[in-house]
């Protein structure tokens, strides 16, 4: 049998097979990346860390629920800021460093490592954790460890990759681009897959309160709540799988 060559990696640190799908960006104030495909920023102009803490941590009752073996899944890895914010929250919960969280994230349009670094340099609070993240990404790794967190990045169309995933999450970060601009990420079929890959009593949180998204999640089995949004945004959504 002929030897299968090792995959080659681009200068951006991504396998060349997904190079053509690398996110195309513009920038606001040289600090906030905007996906040109969807004309949508990757995080709030009023504070990325604070937004993640309010929406994805607060909406999932984290870090209070975090414990060894806890599993988080995410739709939309982007800059990796949600992962870094989680890591910052986990450290005080596990001061001896004995526990391990599991973090699986699904991303169709990976950001080039140089662009990730450009976005994350504006969050010095997370610098100690972003450095090993960027190193792993530069090496083309899709499975690696940060302090206290085992990370798995799944590239490809989530409508294909999520059904093939064998895991279940205790908490979901639903962070795709706006439902109005990226409706494929928020349809009934995909929200049913999210529920299928959620442990009983597991939760989700998302920045959007769009009615059709809430109905899709409720139809999939979640008890959905509408909560105050971040930084003047009227509402966000969170829920529990019953």
Protein language model regions, located:
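Rossmann-like AdoMet
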Residues: 1-73, 87-124
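Conserved glycine-centered beta->alpha loop in an early N-terminal alpha/beta scaffold
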Residues: 76
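S-adenosyl-L-methionine
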Residues: 115-165
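Short SAM/SAH-binding signature in class I
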Residues: 151-153, 167-176
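Conserved beta-strand signature within the Rossmann-like core of class I S-adenosyl-L-methionine
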Residues: 200-208
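Class I S-adenosyl-L-methionine
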Residues: 209-242
């Amino acid at each position: 049998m002929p030897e299968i060559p090792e995959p080659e990696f681009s200068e951006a640190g991504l396998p060349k097979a997904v190079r053509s799908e690398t996110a195309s960006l513009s920038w606001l104030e040289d600090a906030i990346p905007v996906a040109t495909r969807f004309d949508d920023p990757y995080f709030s102009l009023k504070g990325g860390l604070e937004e993640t803490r309010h929406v994805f941590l607060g909406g999932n009752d984290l870090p209070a629920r975090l414990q060894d073996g806890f599993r988080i899944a995410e739709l939309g890895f982007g800059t990796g800021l949600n992962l870094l914010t989680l890591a910052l929250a986990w450290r005080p919960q596990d001061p001896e460093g004995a526990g391990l969280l599991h973090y699986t994230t699904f991303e169709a349009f990976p950001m080039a490592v140089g662009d990730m670094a450009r976005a994350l340099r504006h969050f010095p609070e997370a610098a100690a954790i972003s450095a090993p993240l960027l190193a792993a990404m530069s090496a083309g790794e899709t499975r690696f460890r940060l302090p206290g967190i085992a990370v798995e990045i799944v590239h490809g169309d989530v409508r294909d990759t999520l059904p093939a995933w064998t895991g279940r999450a205790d908490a979901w970060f639903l962070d795709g681009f706006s439902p109005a601009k990226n409706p494929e990420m928020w349809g009934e079929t995909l929200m049913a897959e999210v529920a299928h890959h959620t442990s009983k009593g597991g939760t989700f949180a998302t920045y959007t309160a769009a009615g059709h998204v809430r109905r899709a999640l409720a139809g999939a089995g979640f008890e959905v709540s509408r909560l105050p949004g971040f930084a003047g945004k009227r509402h966000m959504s969170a829920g529990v799988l019953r």
